[in-house]
Amino acid sequence: MRLVFAGTPEFARLALEALLAAGHEIPLVLTQPDRPAGRGLKLTPSPVKEAALAAGIEVAQPRSLRLDGRYPDEALAAQARLVAVAPEVMVVAAYGLILPRWTLALPARGCLNIHASLLPRWRGAAPIQRAIEAGDARTGVTIMQMDDGLDTGDMLLERTVPIGAETTAAVLHDELARVGAEAIVAALADLPALAPRKQPEQGVTYAAKLDKAEAALKLDESAELLARRIRAFNPVPGASLRLPGLNEPVKVWQAEALPESSPAAPGTVLRASAQGVDIATGQGVLRLLELQKAGGKRQSAEVFVRGWQPA
């Protein structure tokens, strides 16, 4: 099938490579412009761009696809290329740009999106993190037909993935990327036979974009919620808190809620040992298992406590 692929991060790269391996013709890839990255802030191509160029595919990187937006010349150029390519389907995976109506209407069979949740739960920008944060036991991937709304299109195919008690966003991301790549290949293979299904009106939730301010843990919340949030924010933006005796916040990469309570004020360090740093919270006790001082490396609690003494 003749496709155009629109995507940007690692999640999308796996889908692009799977589509190529399945024999689909992809003459054009859309991805976001190169961004500064690393300590030197060197302009760096997206994972999708790297994969496309390695496969000899033309890449377009408009800053917007809105013909009436801030970059109309770039949008017009992209429109001209899409019209010339005349795709049967556009596959979209974490592209990062809004697709205006002209884009949605251009492919003969429409635009299919790989969304990292079981819709209608967790529509929006951060479905992986919000599913972990909420304590969901499962999530998955939905292949849907795109429309004007925010992840509101008809569903073609779903794949379910369990969320384990220790699953981080990094681990879940990689699993959903793999499942999503398999799902889009399967959906395209069965496209004529797949019956679009309306999303249920019940159970709609929105996965708000991550805010860096959320990374600072509020210890008056429950230990269970804090432990989930630490997993949800691993690796980005990375949860943090302040510990006595240290001037800078400490990143927390792994923690668990202990089956005990404490009358101490939230934030009180109860114990610091090789087993972990135990902190009183608004409800329960949070044990920190893996930490990172500002400018330092990740350390197990056992190593961390050797070089730290609570004031």
From Swiss-Prot:
What keywords is this UniProt entry annotated with?
Protein biosynthesis, Transferase
User: Per UniProt, where does (6S)-5,6,7,8-tetrahydrofolate bind?
Assistant: S117, L118, L119, P120
Q: Which CDD domains match?
A: FMT_core_Met-tRNA-FMT_N (cd08646), Met_tRNA_FMT_C (cd08704)
Which is one Gene Ontology cellular component term of this protein?
cytosol
Enzyme class (EC, first level): transferase
Q: Write one Gene Ontology MF term.
A: methionyl-tRNA formyltransferase activity
Question: Pfam families under this entry?
Answer: Formyl_trans_C (PF02911), Formyl_trans_N (PF00551)
Q: What is its EC number?
A: 2.1.2.9
Question: InterPro entries, per this entry?
Answer: Fmt, Formyl_trans_C, Formyl_trans_C_sf, Formyl_transf_N, Formyl_transf_N_sf, Formyl_transferase-like_C_sf, GART_AS, Met-tRNA-FMT_C
Reactions catalysed: L-methionyl-tRNA(fMet) + (6R)-10-formyltetrahydrofolate = N-formyl-L-methionyl-tRNA(fMet) + (6S)-5,6,7,8-tetrahydrofolate + H(+)
Q: Answer whether the UniProt record assigns the keyword Electron transport to this protein.
A: no
| HAMAP family, per database record | Formyl_trans (MF_00182)
| Function recorded in the entry | Attaches a formyl group to the free amino group of methionyl-tRNA(fMet). The formyl group appears to play a dual role in the initiator identity of N-formylmethionyl-tRNA by promoting its recognition by IF2 and preventing the misappropriation of this tRNA by the elongation apparatus.
Family listed = Belongs to the Fmt family.
Q: What is this protein called?
A: Methionyl-tRNA formyltransferase
* Species annotation: Bordetella avium (strain 197N)
**Name of the gene this protein is made from:** fmt
